[in-house]
């Protein structure tokens, strides 16, 4: 479905958005191997996920005519201290709006915010095959850095996972401390959301 891009609104998610976001995620769980979850999470569990991510990282939604039609978020990919400059990205869009560039816009916003947080590397774990996701990551200049064959089992088949990586800043000799998303200047965040 084509949409009027000037009517798109990008903003930070809130816990109150959980049920609407879950409506987008549900078909990915129930009908695809794009996510390795077997069961659709409850609204309460999803609220908790949003709350936890927003403690440190961005969780962005795209609204169109008062409906959430896409979302993207980042989170810490590994727990050891030396990995703190790395983040994993995820993006999901309502299938009815595929081909409108929503995923690209969400990713662009996410990456710009992560730069302000002093994140250096971003990663995406993409089930194989997933042509649309591969195109998205190629568009942003991600490199394929690993392929794990048969690493997940869903719907009676084994599925591989491709790891994509992108450096979003230089590799400083002494990296700056990571900032929580709440520590970023609100004016700068507003400008990024309106890119």
Please identify what each model-predicted range represents.
Residues 9-21:
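A short beta-loop-alpha structural element at the N-terminal edge
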Residues 114-126:
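Conserved GNAT acetyl-CoA-binding A-motif
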